[in-house]
């Protein structure tokens, strides 16, 4: 299926001024389609889920960097590792990053299939054995890799640690001990670069399809999720 037959959402960097001109706004249909067909940037290959701005404000690159998450409720600061991996390493890296979480985990599915603009719906499933979860996720590998309206988070609140595979297909790990996650990334030859910029830090476009929306509903059913919370 061609990109122009998919569903698109332009997403601007946080804090962008209202009325900011999109790099896509004056493109012909042919130029837009040509840009959206490009998946390879040097050695890095994107999935179908997302494409960078036409003017390449951020060039997709493999690597990871350290960051910090501030919880406004608890006023706690949690160390974070954010990573981008090329297509052929991405899903296996995500699966390997789940191992440090332990045997029993909670799962959050994030969807923006039926929402306009910003915002998404989160669906929760508590207490699932990690081997069972992995088996289910492998069945939905193509959708999870290529659907720009689906994200997933897996967490162990007792540790606490969390791994996200978000809508942009970035890998994000939270926890006070990040070494187990960094070890996985190094084993996958994903190198640390704390100056790395991610596709989320500039204008970009998401891609989805009706087929992926249907597969999301099937995944939701397989995980025993009924209702969710909008954000």
Where are these regions (language model features)?
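Structured alpha/beta or helical-core interaction and ligand-binding surfaces enriched in interleaved
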Residues: 2-170, 174-231
